[in-house]
Design a protein with these regions (language model features):
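N-terminal small-domain helix-loop-helix segment of the aminotransferase-like
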Residues: 3, 10-102, 109
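CheY-like receiver
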Residues: 23, 110, 159-163
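Short, solvent-exposed loop/turn segments at secondary-structure junctions
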Residues: 40-44, 128, 177-179
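Short acidic capping loops at alpha-helix termini that bridge into adjacent secondary structure
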Residues: 91-97, 117-120, 167
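Conserved PLP-anchoring active-site segment centered on the Schiff-base-forming lysine
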Residues: 113-135
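A short helix-loop-beta submotif of the ANL/AMP-binding
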Residues: 136-143
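Active-site phosphate-binding strand-loop segment of PLP-dependent enzymes
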Residues: 143, 148-183
C-alpha cells in the first residue's frame, strides 16, 4: 500500500528542500563548502549555549517538572509581561501570554485555533514555509503579499491592501523577517 500526502499540502512548497537543496548537494560533491543555515540548528556552526546556561539546566534538572502549565511557565510569562510593561505597552496581562516549545509549535497551534475552512491569511513572500503549511493544514488559504528585495524586503503596503478580502482573517508580520532578515 502506498501512502500519499494530504491534498491539504498542494500549495505548500519549501524551495530549500527542493531544487536549491539539489544544487547545494551538487556543489558539495564538487568540493564546495556549503553552510546550510536553513536547518534552524545553530550548533553545527559553532553557536552553542553559554556555559552558564548549561550549568543552570544541569543544576535544575532534579527539581524539573514533567509538565508546565499549558500556557507556559508562570515566571517566564511574568517576565515577558513586565518587559512589555516597561516598554509602555498597554493591555498585556499574564493571562494573555502563551509560551511553547518553539515558534513552529506556536504557529501551528495559533492557525488551528484561529482559522475556519476558507479563511485567508496574508503571508509575506518570500515566506518561512511553515506559515503556508500551517494555514493550509488548518483549512485556511495562504495569500502571499510582496516583500520586494528592491525595497529592502519591506512589505508592499499597496499589495497587502489589494489582497484583503472579506475572507481575510489574519495578517502575518514578522520582525525580523524570516527568511529575508528585514527589520
Amino acid at each position: 500500500m502506498q501512502v500519499s500526502k494530504s491534498n491539504k499540502l498542494a500549495n505548500v512548497c519549501y524551495d530549500i528542500r527542493g531544487p536549491v537543496l539539489k544544487h547545494a548537494k551538487r556543489l558539495e560533491e564538487e568540493g564546495h563548502r556549503i553552510l546550510k543555515l536553513n536547518i534552524g540548528n545553530p550548533a553545527p556552526f559553532g553557536f552553542e549555549a553559554p556555559e552558564e546556561i548549561l550549568q543552570d539546566v544541569i543544576r535544575n534538572l532534579p527539581t524539573a517538572q514533567g509538565y508546565s502549565d499549558s500556557k507556559g511557565l508562570f515566571s517566564a510569562r511574568k517576565a515577558i509581561m513586565q518587559y512589555y510593561q516597561q516598554k509602555q505597552v498597554e493591555g498585556i496581562g499574564i493571562e494573555d501570554i502563551y509560551l511553547g516549545n518553539g515558534v513552529s509549535e506556536l504557529i501551528v497551534m495559533s492557525m488551528q485555533a484561529l482559522l475556519n475552512n476558507g479563511d485567508e491569511v496574508l503571508i509575506p513572500a518570500p515566506d518561512y514555509p511553515l506559515w503556508t503549511a500551517a494555514v493550509s493544514l488548518a483549512g485556511g488559504k495562504p495569500v502571499h503579499y510582496l516583500c520586494d528585495e528592491q525595497a529592502n524586503w519591506w512589505p508592499d503596503l499597496a499589495d497587502i491592501k489589494a489582497k484583503i478580502t472579506p475572507n481575510t482573517k489574519a495578517l502575518v508580520l514578522i520582525n525580523p523577517n524570516n527568511p529575508t532578515g528585514a527589520v
